[in-house]
């Protein structure tokens, strides 16, 4: 296994099976963040992740963190909060503000560089990247964004400025995504937050098999049209 230097003149990637074991999943470096290359990456289970000042790094970790949306873990406290929630949730209303919120909400710094923001804005303009917004009155208090691959959604980042705002974004999105034919959410790398919401780890080979099948399955017509999302209260 060796780290591959990508060419700016080809958008091809090496097989994810050749990724390094340490650091886990590092596959390649270089290239660019053009829409064509980003889409090629997601179609093959690869994503960019690098710090400011570093070269572009491409990853495909093993195991892979995923969330089956119908298995979202709704804790008792979150259920009580949601039933009396002051929030309103929308889809694709404010992509620029969501990615900006994700980039600027971490005190310890962020991997979402200006180049990353611009690249995913282009993907959004092309209909491939999407945002979920959480509002309190007219204030954006949380949200998440990611890239669609048919019935699979590749979650990229989320942020929260008020209590349970990012959890609300994922909860409502999971319900709506499932109702319209969505099958799986890619969480990339497991962490305590996503694990508490139901994310699990599966072998990379299994993830790649799911991706190959699900990216061919379309969601219900016009699913990504900007609109308000609702979840029945129980």
UniProtKB/Swiss-Prot annotation:
Similarity annotation: Belongs to the L/F-transferase family.
Keyword list, A-Z: Acyltransferase, Cytoplasm, Transferase
Protein name (record): Leucyl/phenylalanyl-tRNA--protein transferase
Taxonomy, superkingdom: Bacteria
UniProt-listed HAMAP family: Leu_Phe_trans
Acyltransferase among keywords: yes
GO cellular component, one term: cytoplasm
Organism name: Salmonella schwarzengrund (strain CVM19633)
Catalytic activity reported: N-terminal L-lysyl-[protein] + L-leucyl-tRNA(Leu) = N-terminal L-leucyl-L-lysyl-[protein] + tRNA(Leu) + H(+); N-terminal L-arginyl-[protein] + L-leucyl-tRNA(Leu) = N-terminal L-leucyl-L-arginyl-[protein] + tRNA(Leu) + H(+); L-phenylalanyl-tRNA(Phe) + an N-terminal L-alpha-aminoacyl-[protein] = an N-terminal L-phenylalanyl-L-alpha-aminoacyl-[protein] + tRNA(Phe)
A GO MF label: leucyl-tRNA--protein transferase activity
Task of the protein: Functions in the N-end rule pathway of protein degradation where it conjugates Leu, Phe and, less efficiently, Met from aminoacyl-tRNAs to the N-termini of proteins containing an N-terminal arginine or lysine.
InterPro entries in alphabetical order: Acyl_CoA_acyltransferase, Leu/Phe-tRNA_Trfase, Leu/Phe-tRNA_Trfase_C, Leu/Phe-tRNA_Trfase_N
Enzyme class: transferase
Subcellular location: Cytoplasm
Upper taxonomic lineage: Bacteria, Pseudomonadati, Pseudomonadota, Gammaproteobacteria, Enterobacterales
EC number(s) recorded for this UniProt protein: 2.3.2.6
GO biological process per UniProt: protein catabolic process
């Amino acid at each position: 296994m060796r780290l591959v230097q990508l060419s700016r003149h080809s958008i091809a990637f090496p097989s994810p099976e050749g990724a390094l074991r340490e650091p886990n999943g590092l596959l390649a470096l270089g290239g660019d963040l053009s829409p064509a290359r980003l889409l090629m990456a997601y179609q093959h289970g690869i994503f960019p992740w690098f710090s400011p000042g570093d070269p572009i790094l491409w990853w495909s970790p093993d195991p892979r963190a995923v969330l089956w949306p119908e298995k979202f873990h709704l804790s008792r406290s979150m259920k009580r909060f949601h039933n009396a929630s002051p929030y309103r949730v929308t889809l694709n209303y404010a992509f620029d503000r969501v990615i900006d919120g994700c980039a600027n909400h971490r005190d310890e710094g962020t991997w979402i560089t200006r180049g990353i923001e611009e690249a995913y804005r282009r993907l959004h303009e092309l209909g491939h990247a999407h945002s979920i917004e959480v509002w309190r009155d007219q204030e954006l208090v949380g949200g998440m964004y990611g890239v669609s691959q048919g019935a699979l959604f590749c979650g990229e980042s989320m942020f929260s400025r008020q209590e349970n705002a990012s959890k609300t974004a994922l909860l409502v999105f999971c319900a709506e995504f499932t109702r319209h034919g969505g099958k799986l959410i890619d969480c990339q790398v497991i962490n305590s937050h996503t694990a508490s919401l139901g994310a699990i780890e599966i072998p990379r080979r299994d993830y790649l098999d799911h991706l190959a099948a699900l990216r061919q399955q379309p969601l219900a017509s016009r699913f990504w049209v900007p609109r308000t999302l609702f979840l029945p209260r129980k």
